[in-house]
Every structure is written in C-alpha cells, then in structure tokens.
C-alpha cells in the first residue's frame, strides 16, 4: 500500500516554492524522495529555499519562473524534461494577496481597490490555469501525471 502512494523518484514541479507554504511542501517532497523543481519569481527567496532543500536531498533544482508568463513556463517545462525526462506532479501553490484587494471589517465592498483586485484575481486564477496548461500538456504526452492546486486564506 505504501508504494501506491509513494512519491519517491517522482518529478514534482512546485510553483511558489520560495514562499512559506510552497517551501514547506517542497521540503516534505524532498524528504520523501521526490525530485523537486522549485519555481518562484523571486530570485533571493528561491536561492535560499533551494539551499535549504538540498540539506534533505540533492535532487532539487530552482528555476525562476513567472506563473503568468506562458513563455517562461514553457521554458521551465523544457528544462525539467531535458534534466529528468518527465513531469509527474505539478503543485500550483503560487498566489497571494496585496494591500487594497481585501477589506477591513469597517470597509464596504464598494470601497475595494479594483486594480488591486484584478491583479490578485489574475495571479490566483491564471497563475493556476497557465501552469496547468503547460505542464498538463507534458503529462498528457506521457499519459500520466497529477496536478494539485493549493490555496490559502491569503489568496
């Protein structure tokens, strides 16, 4: 039964891996023997996270990627397939919030900053759809793969 749910040797692409949630999940995957591709748009956070993850295993690479940029995601997919030959798991974790897109208890819905709301909605919706399209295409060619979408209260 344990082999059925094992991720050992699986190639897992994790968006938002430089953040707390993505980083913690990436750590768990590395500890379970997965090959982890940590993706984040923030270079410093990504570098720090990859260094931390390598304490648990060497099958970790960090790639700068923007979940809202199809060309960036296609490049990541090509790099991953070139290195490990497959993509087994996509974890869509990148997302978040920003000031102005949420309401304080005393604020009204009509007081919300529309431009902030649109940016947050774009990140949290399209930032899940675009990676799913690009990495899902690789998985479809392989005839196997798993896409996991994760969100938080901040999103």
Placement of each model-derived feature along the sequence:
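Canonical Rossmann dinucleotide-binding motif of NAD(H)/NADP(H)-dependent dehydrogenases/reductases
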Residues: 5-37
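A glycine-rich helix->loop->beta "capping" turn
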Residues: 7, 56-59, 79-92, 98, ...
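Conserved glycine-rich Rossmann-like NAD(P)H-binding loop of the short-chain dehydrogenase/reductase
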Residues: 32-48
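The beta1-alpha1 cofactor-binding region of Rossmann-like NAD(H)/NADP(H)-dependent oxidoreductases
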Residues: 43-44, 64-76, 114
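Active-site Tyr-X3-Lys motif and surrounding loop/helix of classical short-chain dehydrogenase/reductase
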Residues: 75-82, 101-111, 115-122
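Catalytic Tyr-X3-Lys loop
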Residues: 88, 96, 110-129, 144, ...
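A short, exposed helix-loop element centered on a Lys and neighboring polar residues
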Residues: 132-133
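Residue(s) in the substrate-gating loop at a strand-loop-helix junction
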Residues: 152
């Amino acid at each position: 039964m344990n082999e059925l749910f094992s991720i050992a040797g699986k190639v897992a692409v994790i968006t938002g891996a430089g953040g707390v949630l993505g980083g913690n999940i990436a750590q768990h995957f590395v500890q379970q023997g997965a090959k982890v591709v940590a993706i984040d748009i923030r270079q410093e956070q990504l570098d720090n996270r990859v260094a931390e993850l390598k304490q648990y295993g060497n099958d970790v690479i960090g790639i700068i990627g923007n979940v809202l940029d199809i060309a960036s995601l296609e490049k990541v997919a090509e790099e991953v397939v070139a290195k490990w030959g497959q993509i087994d798991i996509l974890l869509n974790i990148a997302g978040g919030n920003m000031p102005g897109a949420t309401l304080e208890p005393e604020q009204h819905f009509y007081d919300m900053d529309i431009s902030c709301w649109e940016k947050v909605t774009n990140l949290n919706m399209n930032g899940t759809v675009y990676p799913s399209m690009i990495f899902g295409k690789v998985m479809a060619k392989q005839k196997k793969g798993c896409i996991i979408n994760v969100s938080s209260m901040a999103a």
